[in-house]
Amino acid sequence: MSTLGHQYDNSLVSNAFGFLRLPMNFQPYDSDADWVITGVPFDMATSGRAGGRHGPAAIRQVSTNLAWEHNRFPWNFDMRERLNVVDCGDLVYAFGDAREMSEKLQAHAEKLLAAGKRMLSFGGDHFVTLPLLRAHAKHFGKMALVHFDAHTDTYANGCEFDHGTMFYTAPKEGLIDPNHSVQIGIRTEFDKDNGFTVLDACQVNDRSVDDVIAQVKQIVGDMPVYLTFDIDCLDPAFAPGTGTPVIGGLTSDRAIKLVRGLKDLNIVGMDVVEVAPAYDQSEITALAAATLALEMLYIQAAKKGE
């Protein structure tokens, strides 16, 4: 099958059909799309349970359950009538070649951004965010990061391709400004001197959504924002299908409300990562990821409609 970049794809885990039953467009660069969905079936950088390469396919598959609702509750409008979204399928790269994946993903993102598109990406493990940040920083300059996760991913002792080091590397490369960045839902050890504002899961669960959002807006300001959501930010009761689950996380309800609260930020890129469907129950993790991705698109559509 000829796919993104006119490459033959013999993968068993990618390029089946589009998110929300959207038509596939394997040549999105010259399209009239506002937002382009790209899957990145990569999990070579994971430190825990593998299987994130199946994440994009799982998110798309379960998204058929969301496609029927036109005036989505509680938005009361159809995102597809305000926002032109296309799904360009999955990145094709040589199996086992992490460097090629990283370089191809960055090049793909740079080409889309240069054509005036915005990106919503599906991982894959969280390492895929780093080449996406590199591409976005070239286009938008230094950004703020709004990061939902159980882990800060700011660890300094990892290797070149490691899903726990991206946000140690990104500030060093000048891609993001930690002083204007927020990490939400953290509940594992981290270096308190890394510059990020960390809103741990205990705080986020105990405070009101409005209070948390007000703090996020104050920290981020008017900077361009990259929004990344690692599904293990959710408690394993709501997202068991992930590589490194941690008890004590957010409910899916709270996460959705927090994402909705980000509507007024200048979000220039988004991703949802770390869905590993082999460990899922009744597709609830994939459904949570697909729903969060849809809410991300809705906040863009709501802003466009103002």
From Swiss-Prot:
<dbReference type="GO" id="GO:0008295">
    <property type="term" value="P:spermidine biosynthetic process"/>
</dbReference>
<feature type="binding site">
    <location>
        <position position="151"/>
    </location>
    <ligand>
        <name>Mn(2+) 2</name>
    </ligand>
</feature>
<dbReference type="InterPro" id="IPR020855">
    <property type="entry name" value="Ureohydrolase_Mn_BS"/>
</dbReference>
<keyword id="KW-0464">Manganese</keyword>
<keyword id="KW-0620">Polyamine biosynthesis</keyword>
<dbReference type="GO" id="GO:0005829">
    <property type="term" value="C:cytosol"/>
</dbReference>
<feature type="binding site">
    <location>
        <position position="232"/>
    </location>
    <ligand>
        <name>Mn(2+) 2</name>
    </ligand>
</feature>
<dbReference type="GO" id="GO:0033389">
    <property type="term" value="P:putrescine biosynthetic process from arginine, via agmatine"/>
</dbReference>
<dbReference type="Pfam" id="PF00491">
    <property type="entry name" value="Arginase"/>
</dbReference>
<feature type="binding site">
    <location>
        <position position="149"/>
    </location>
    <ligand>
        <name>Mn(2+) 2</name>
    </ligand>
</feature>
<keyword id="KW-0479">Metal-binding</keyword>
<comment type="pathway">
    <text>Amine and polyamine biosynthesis; putrescine biosynthesis via agmatine pathway; putrescine from agmatine: step 1/1.</text>
</comment>
<dbReference type="InterPro" id="IPR023694">
    <property type="entry name" value="Agmatinase"/>
</dbReference>
<dbReference type="InterPro" id="IPR005925">
    <property type="entry name" value="Agmatinase-rel"/>
</dbReference>
<feature type="binding site">
    <location>
        <position position="230"/>
    </location>
    <ligand>
        <name>Mn(2+) 2</name>
    </ligand>
</feature>
<protein>
    <recommendedName>
        <fullName>Agmatinase</fullName>
        <ecNumber>3.5.3.11</ecNumber>
    </recommendedName>
</protein>
<keyword id="KW-0661">Putrescine biosynthesis</keyword>
<dbReference type="GO" id="GO:0042802">
    <property type="term" value="F:identical protein binding"/>
</dbReference>
<feature type="binding site">
    <location>
        <position position="126"/>
    </location>
    <ligand>
        <name>Mn(2+) 1</name>
    </ligand>
</feature>
<feature type="binding site">
    <location>
        <position position="149"/>
    </location>
    <ligand>
        <name>Mn(2+) 1</name>
    </ligand>
</feature>
<comment type="function">
    <text>Catalyzes the formation of putrescine from agmatine.</text>
</comment>
<dbReference type="InterPro" id="IPR006035">
    <property type="entry name" value="Ureohydrolase"/>
</dbReference>
<dbReference type="InterPro" id="IPR023696">
    <property type="entry name" value="Ureohydrolase_dom_sf"/>
</dbReference>
<keyword id="KW-0745">Spermidine biosynthesis</keyword>
<feature type="site" description="Important for catalytic activity">
    <location>
        <position position="163"/>
    </location>
</feature>
<dbReference type="GO" id="GO:0030145">
    <property type="term" value="F:manganese ion binding"/>
</dbReference>
<feature type="binding site">
    <location>
        <position position="153"/>
    </location>
    <ligand>
        <name>Mn(2+) 1</name>
    </ligand>
</feature>
<keyword id="KW-0378">Hydrolase</keyword>
<dbReference type="GO" id="GO:0008783">
    <property type="term" value="F:agmatinase activity"/>
</dbReference>
<feature type="binding site">
    <location>
        <position position="230"/>
    </location>
    <ligand>
        <name>Mn(2+) 1</name>
    </ligand>
</feature>
<comment type="similarity">
    <text>Belongs to the arginase family. Agmatinase subfamily.</text>
</comment>
